[in-house]
C-alpha cells in the first residue's frame, strides 16, 4: 500500500533532505489559520489549515533564517510533479516570496525556478540541492550576497520572535529588504511598493520593517506618513508598542516639533501641510531639513495623488522609501468616469515612482487562507433605478425645492433623472424608505439571535441622503422593538460623515454592543477605521471608483472571533460589486520609467465648480426591489470574484466527486483524519470552502460530512444531534452486545459528536470530558477491545447511520 501525503513527507522526504543538510532548524512549517467552523452558533477554526514547508538558509547561528524555497509532498503513488505546472509553481513561489518550489513523492523530485519559469525533469531525491547550493543560486538571482552590509536587515531577527507574524507578512518584509539590498548593489534609489489587502496587517509589517532596520544599525530617523487621523492614531500606537518613547506624533507645540527627539515620526499630510496639491508645506520645511529621514513609509499611498507626498520624498531623496497600498496592481476599469480616471492616475503615479510591487497579497488569497472573512453578496435592483424618472412623472406629483419646501416649476426640472442622480439632484423619500425596509428586513432575518443588532455600514450618495437613511432605519427599528415588546438600544442608526463630526461616534461603532449599530456615511468610513465586528456593508450609492470600492469592502473583511463574526454580507442595490470583476490595469506615464525617476508633476488646477443647484424632492412613487441573486466571493485565477451560489455549489460538488466518486468512497476517507484533510485541502486549493458553503446554506447545526454528502451525493442531511440519535437507533444491537460500561462510554463519546461534530469525536481530550469520564472513560472502553479500534468503529457507524 502506497504512503499518504503526510506519511510520504515524514517517512521519505524528511529523511532524504535531512541527509542533504536540511536539518530541522532550516525547515519552517507555515500553518495557515484554516477554514472557519461554526459550532453551536459560535465560530472556531478547523484544527489546522494548510501547512506549507519552507526551506531556509542561515548565515550563522545568530541571524534570522531566510526562506528561499517551498517543498510540496505528494502521495507516494503520484508522479513527483503532480499538479505543479508553471502557473501553480509561480503562484506558490510568489505567495511565499521564494525563488524555488520543489515537489516530491519521496523517491523523485522536480523543481520550479521562479526566475526562469522552468520546471526540471524528475530527479532522484538523493540529488536534492544542499543549503550551500541553493544559497549560491539564490544570491545570484537576487543580485547581492548575504554577507553584504546591505543585506544586514534581512538577516536581523524579529525583535519579539517569529510567533506573531504570518507567512505572508514575513514574505512581504523579506521582499522589501531584498529590493533595498539589490538597489544598494546597483546604486539605484531604494524604493519598494507593497500591495496587501485591507485587514492583513500593513501596519504590523511597517513596524517590523523599521524595527529590524533599527536593530541592524541602519535606521537614523524614520517617517511614517498617512492621510487620516484614525490611521495616525493606530500607527502611533503600533509604533510605540515597538519603539516605546522613540516613536512620537508630529505636531507643533509652542513652535517646536513634538517628535523632534524621536527616531520614528508619525504624521499626517495635514500636519506637514501637504494635504493639498497647493498646500503650504511650511511645517515640513521649518522642522525638517533635506535628507533628515533615512527611511520613509507612506501608508495607504493608493489614496494619495503624487502632488501630495512628492515634496516629502524629493526632500529626502536618499531615504529608503516604502509605499503601502491595498489596491490591486492589476486594475483595469472599463468605465472611463472621472473617478476611475483619477484612480488610474494615482495607480500610475505609484507604479511609476516605486516600480511594480515587490510583493502582493490580495483579498482572494487572504480569504482562502482564512485571514479575512468570507463574503456573501445579496444583489438587488430598484425598479426606479432600472428606468429613470421623467419630467412628466415628477410634475404630476407636486415637486418641491428640497431646501425650502417651495414648489418648483417644470423649467427647474430635468427631462429625465437617471439612477446616478437619485438622492443627489432628485430626492425620492419613497425610494429611501423602500430600500431601508428591504435592508432592515434582510438583516433581521439573517440572524435570528442578533436580529437587527448587527454592526452595519451603509454607503450613501450625499450627506443629506445619509441623514434620511439613518432616520428611516431608526423608525424601522423603533417599530420592530415595539412589535416585539423589547427595549430599544439607542442610538441605533447614526450618521457618520465629515460634516457631522462622525469620528466622535467611531468608538461606539467599534466597541459598543448596546448602541450604534447602523452607520450611514458617504465616504468617511471608506478607510482608516478598524471595526472588526461589522457584519454588513450596504451600497445605497452608485460607485465608479474601483479604489474606493475596495476600501469600502475592506470595512467588512476583518474577522472578529470574539463575536463569532467569520463572514460578512454585502447588500448591493446599485451594482457596486461589479467592480470586483474589474482588472483596472493602468500604465505608468511614458516619461522616465522603471520606478527610478520622479513622479509626474501636478496637472493644471481646475476652476472651482459653480454652486450646486438645490435638489428637487418628490413623493408618491411606488418602489419595489427585484432580487438579482446571491453570490459568494471566491478566488478565481488568483482574483476575488463574485460567483453565483448555484455555480459555486456545482463547482464544489464536481471537485469533491472528482476526489471521491461515490458516497462510500467519501465516507471511507472521511473517517480517516489524514485522508479527510486531503479531501478538504483539494477542495480549498480549487477555490472553494466547505465551511463557507455551510454558512451560506445556514446549516450550522450540521457536520461538514452531511453538508458535503448532501451536495455531492444527494444524502439526506442530518443535524449533528439527529445523526447521534440515528447512531443509537440503527446500531442498538451492536451497542447492546458490548459490556455495559463500554456501551455507556461509547454513548457518551457519541454525544460529543452532537456538540462538536467530526472533530468532537477526534478531540484528543475526549477522555477528560466530564460525560465520558463519568461513563468510565478509556478504562471502561478496554473491556470492548483496543480503545483505538473501538473508537474507529464508532466513527464508521456514526457516519453510516
Residue spans of the language-model regions?
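Conserved helicase ATPase motor motifs in RecA-like P-loop NTPase domains
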Residues: 197-198, 300-303, 315-334, 370
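Interdomain helical connector at the RecA1-RecA2 junction of SF1/SF2 helicase-like NTPases
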Residues: 336-453
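SF2 helicase catalytic motif II
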Residues: 284-323
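ATP-dependent helicase/translocase motor core
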Residues: 1-221, 230-246, 260-264, 270, ...
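Long, largely alpha-helical accessory region at the distal end of helicase-like NTP-driven motors
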Residues: 158-162, 175, 412-424, 434, ...
